[in-house]
A protein has these predicted regions:
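Catalytic cores of secreted or luminal carbohydrate-active enzymes
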Residues: 145, 150-156
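Beta-rich carbohydrate-recognition and catalytic domains
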Residues: 1-30, 34-81, 88-140, 153-155
Length: 156
């Protein structure tokens, strides 16, 4: 982990790195978000062909809350570059959570691709509302590493 005290101009490595370790292959690509309902930081981490979901109160100590992916979505390649975001449902007052998963290879036309899952998230566990359906963000053969930003100007 690294941190900044000057709004991202410079970074310092945390003295007690690593903050999280694993014996699993392909343990990478952490995405960290703030979960307002639980008042905790949430990290989604790619591990092989699954996503692991962790929580933390301080960004230094992490607890494994759940795993997602077994039996869901495409598994033609390594799962990478996860993202987790809450979005409004158009025309309603509802919101749903979207878990984004990039894989390489394994896309519908070969090469890399981005799949996504829509469902609920309670701060510990993501539940896919349609596990029998694989949803693709793009039908090209090289769409990859989709990311979102937090606190962007004008809520973009």
């Amino acid at each position: 982990m690294a941190y900044s005290l000057d709004n991202g101009k410079t970074f310092k490595k945390y003295a007690r790195n690593p903050i999280l370790t694993s014996t699993q292959r392909d343990f990478r690509d952490p995405k960290v978000i703030w979960h307002e309902d639980t008042k905790k930081w949430i990290m989604v981490l790619a591990v092989g062909q699954e996503m692991e979901i962790y929580s933390s109160a301080d960004l230094k100590s992490w607890t494994l809350e759940s795993k997602f992916g077994e039996g869901q979505g495409a598994h033609g390649g390594v799962w990478e570059c996860p993202d987790l975001l809450e979005l409004p449902v158009e025309g309603t007052e509802l919101k749903k959570w979207v878990l984004v998963c990039n894989l390489n290879p394994g896309g519908p036309f070969g090469g890399s691709a981005t799949q996504y899952f829509v469902g609920t998230f309670d701060g510990k566990r993501f539940v896919n509302e349609s596990p029998a359906v694989t949803k693709w963000m793009d039908w090209g053969k090289d769409h990859y590493a989709t990311v979102t930003w937090s606190d962007a100007p004008d809520n973009r």
